[in-house]
Amino acid sequence: MVLIINWKMKNTLKVILWIVAVLVALILIMVVVLWIASPGKLPLLKDAEGKVIPGSISERREIILGDIEQGFFIRSENPDNPVILYLHGGPGSPELPMIMAVEERERLEKYFTVCYWDQRGTGMSYRSNLGADDLTVQHYVDDARDLTKYLMERFGKDKIYLMGLSWGSYLGIKVIEQYPELYYAYMGIGQVTHQHLSEQLAYEYMLDHANEVNEHKALKKLGQYDPLSEGFPQLDYLMGTRTTLMNKYGIGIMREDFSMFSLVMDVMMFRGYKMCDKVGYVRGSLLALENVFYFMIDDNLFESSTNFDVPVYIFHGLYDYQVSYALATEYVNMIEAPAKGLYTFEKSAHSPNMEEPARFVRVVRDIAELHHGLIYPLD
């Protein structure tokens, strides 16, 4: 009997050791794959035949902005073209890994020199010693101003274009309020307006939809939160129930074919980042959500930001509830600007630049042709 027990224990131990060995091997393989996929260098821009475009730019840079070193990428098929500074969303979530993952031949970089900046506290610009005092809206505004001046000097421009998505659209509004003289025009994607109300509208939509399809699990999760409470939206709601249901119902980051796993993989396999940048992306997203998101929640642009000295153009997905399409429509109608416009993307949710990239590029070209002169002959 004792021999049988010992035999069973030995075999159980062997199985456990085998499982541990396999897990360790898998982890090592994943680390090696990630390391290989993290050279910290962007691929060169190529034409339709796969040939490198002469004179094109595809680079990673770090400079001091404000009081810390911050990183950004610059991509352009022709550096003489007009310049766009792209402000990512999140806050704390640079989009270039996702943009490149769905990139088509008709890309912004064919007509513009585009700077994708990792804002302070995330990705290349993550620093472990950054706290709430280092992450104010004014810090971001001043950083954007300084980076704009760097781009103007480097590329010999009197002005550039400013573009922002989600949180970046909120930041963009604040930037053009303070420094309108630096920009030809502002373009907001998924334009933030009154985000606290937007979150309430999104909650109501998800609750109604869950009731319509009789989805008890979703109703139970939503029932844990009160959209009229003072602390709404709570951090756990934002990271859990809200994100899950928005993406499931096609009203979040994208209308179709989106998963958080695909987003994570886009970031992890992004060759423009080093391993430390990928760690900084994850940690920075949490840092910004805890310290920056609520600046946007507490502000109502209908009251604080309505008069501008630069043209304002809004790109919004019809199905976007992550940032309300209805509120963005109202906002465009009431603001004062030298020129303004709303472009509705009828197949998109929150990311029309990635969901309908060809039309998005066409509209941006049209705007630039209005304010900058013809860039290329019309197709």
Segments and roles (model prediction):
Residues Y170-G172, E181-S229:
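A catalytic-pocket lid/entrance helix-loop region that shapes and gates access to the active site
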Residues S348-P357, V361:
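Catalytic histidine-centered segment of alpha/beta-hydrolase-like enzymes
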Residues H139-K159:
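Conserved acidic catalytic loop of the alpha/beta-hydrolase fold
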Residues H216-E303, V310:
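Alpha/beta-hydrolase
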Residues R107-R127:
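Conserved alpha/beta-hydrolase
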Residues Y321-L327:
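Conserved alpha/beta-hydrolase "acid-adjacent" motif
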Residues N81-P82, G90-M100, R105, E109, ...:
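Short substrate-entry loop that stabilizes the transition state in hydrolases
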Residues F308, I314-H316, D320:
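Short beta-strand/loop motif that positions the catalytic acidic residue
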